[in-house]
Design a protein with these regions (language model features):
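Eukaryotic beta-rich interaction modules
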Residues: 20-26, 34-46, 53, 158-167, ...
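Disordered, polybasic Ser/Thr-rich segments at the N-terminal boundary of pleckstrin homology
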Residues: 13-35, 216, 222-246
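Catalytic cores of histone-lysine modification enzymes
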Residues: 211-214, 221, 232-334, 340, ...
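Long, charged, low-complexity intrinsically disordered regions
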Residues: 1-154, 161-163
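Aromatic/acidic cage segments in peptide-binding pockets
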Residues: 1, 34, 57-91, 239, ...
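Eukaryotic short linear interaction motifs
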Residues: 49-52, 62-66, 92, 175, ...
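Conserved tryptophan-centered aromatic signature that marks the ligand-binding surface of SH3
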Residues: 36-75, 253-271, 349-363, 367
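Cys/His-rich Zn2+-coordinating "finger/knuckle" modules used by eukaryotic regulatory proteins
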Residues: 160-239, 382-401
Length: 401
């Protein structure tokens, strides 16, 4: 019910732009491609009378305009490299599965091979556009990369990137802050955490120092302290470059860090659509059947609201579960002190190496401070169908719920 059919295909839009001599970078029509032919990707290969030919898809032109070009006419080494790598990758898989008899030297590619190469090229273009879209919409300096070396899955069709909570119709999120601390050198006895009855969450190195279950109160937009205040961490956004990547063990998309992350460092927020608990129960039944887990109850103080990151979210939407995670959830209050609507922040529980996948426990048990009154302040929304866990941890519980 959430999908809306396109009014025109990408190729139709490209052809219209070309006829009207209009450039549109988002659909691949640039001033450069309007003036001259530009190779978008290579589709096929053949040898005729000793000459190698490649079938070329021209940027901004429909596939019906593809032409065979001799190797010496090509001036696209990267695209040729992609073509050869995709071909070798596919043939290698076929040899392993013995599903296709292949030879190292061929005069023409089998249709199934050429079809895979074209799909891979289209996927590469789609993922590149998605990466550019994510980086346009993010509100932090660190980069977001996208990578899929596993299958032909492209960008999610019904996912919209947001940087903060999106209240559902009928829900009003009011930032009730009208005053802030008078500190010029936080923290002091009258700093925001102390005024709320808690200790400062960070040490001098801006690393987390409190136990799980305790809330984080950061300085807000009315405070006198500047942007370098040691109590302004979560509000600055993700400080690390991250990569959304396709996992090779059936867990769909995942997220890995491209930089080393030290212990107790802020990594990212979990954002999504804020809905009522009643609506969460209704949606939960749908998600259960799909095997998805995107609902989080905001039950730090009450059980009135839930965050649904299925359609609206940020990079955290793609973070997988692990029974032995390297991220921990904390409730954060900044410009909104409504205890029913804490912000959800993910902090590292240990040093995470560059290239390592980021995970958190969807049940968030084990490392929680059970002596705290708010130890169960944030928990995944109740689920009715058990989902098998594929985290692979030695301590795996077998199920996500």
């Amino acid at each position: 019910a959430w999908y809306v059919p396109c009014l025109a295909s990408l190729e139709t839009l490209q052809e219209l732009c070309r006829k009207e001599n209009l450039s549109c970078k988002s659909i691949g029509i640039t001033n450069k491609s309007l003036r001259r032919y530009e190779v978008e990707y290579l589709c096929d290969y053949k040898v005729e009378e000793g000459t190698e030919y490649y079938l070329v898809k021209w940027k901004g032109w429909p596939e019906s305009s593809n032409t065979w070009e001799p190797h010496e006419n090509l001036n696209c080494p990267l695209l040729l490299q992609n073509f050869l790598r995709d071909k070798d990758e596919f043939l290698s898989r076929m040899r392993e599965g013995k599903a296709l008899k292949v030879r190292n030297h061929v005069k023409a590619l089998k249709p199934v091979v050429a079809d895979y190469i074209v799909k891979k090229a289209k996927q590469r273009i789609a993922l590149q556009r998605w990466k550019e879209e994510l980086n346009r919409k993010k509100n932090h300096k660190a980069m977001i990369l996208v990578e899929n070396t596993v299958d032909l899955e492209g960008p999610p069709l019904d996912f919209y990137y947001i940087n903060e909570y999106k209240p559902a119709p009928g829900i009003n999120v009011i930032n009730g802050i009208t005053t802030g601390c008078e500190c010029t050198d936080c923290p002091t006895e009258k700093c925001c955490p102390k005024e709320a009855g808690f200790i400062l969450a960070y040490n001098k190195r801006k690393k987390l120092k409190i136990q799980p279950g305790l809330p984080i109160y950061e300085c807000n937009s009315f405070c006198r302290c500047g942007p370098d205040c040691p109590n302004r961490i979560v509000q600055k956004g993700t400080p690390y470059s991250l990569c959304i990547f396709r996992t090779n063990n059936g867990r769909g998309w995942g997220v890995k860090t491209l930089q080393e992350i030290k212990t107790n460092s802020f990594v990212m927020e979990y954002v999504g659509e804020v809905i009522t608990s009643e609506e969460a129960e209704r949606r939960g039944q749908l998600y259960d059947n799909q095997g998805n887990t995107y609902l989080f109850d905001l039950d730090y103080d009450s059980d009135e609201f839930t965050v649904d990151a299925a359609r609206y979210g940020n990079v955290s939407h793609f973070v997988n579960h692990s029974c032995d995670p390297n991220l921990q959830v904390f409730n954060v209050f900044i410009d909104n002190l409504d205890l029913r609507l804490p912000r959800i922040a993910l902090f590292s529980t240990r040093t995470i190496k560059a290239g390592e996948e980021l995970t958190f426990d969807y049940q968030m048990k084990g490392s929680m401070d059970l002596s705290s009154d708010s130890a169960d302040g944030l928990s995944p929304s109740k689920k009715r169908i058990r989902t098998v866990c594929k985290c692979g941890a030695l301590c795996c519980r077998g199920y996500l719920n």
